[in-house]
């Protein structure tokens, strides 16, 4: 069971982004909860529904930071960012 790194890019705040680790089979709802704790912001998920299983390449739109900010899921095994 591999982990997925979700990177929240925040160009508006000139941040390198916020990274949270989630299990490959975690749900969108669970990932949102982790993000709330890390960033205190809100994820408005336009492509997946709560309860959907996360997979490599899933994209989220982070309305809480800026409309066009993108959250990308990558396998953590690739390393780096």
Q: Language model features by range: what are they?
A:
Residues 1-81:
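Ubiquitin system architectures
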């Amino acid at each position: 069971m591999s982990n997925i790194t979700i990177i929240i890019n925040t160009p508006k705040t000139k941040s390198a982004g916020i990274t949270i680790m989630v299990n490959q089979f975690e749900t969108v709802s669970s990932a949102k909860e982790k993000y709330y704790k890390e960033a205190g912001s809100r994820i408005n998920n336009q492509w997946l529904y709560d309860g959907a299983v996360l997979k490599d390449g899933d994209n989220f739109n982070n309305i809480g930071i800026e409309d066009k900010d993108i959250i990308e899921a990558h396998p953590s095994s690739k390393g780096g960012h």
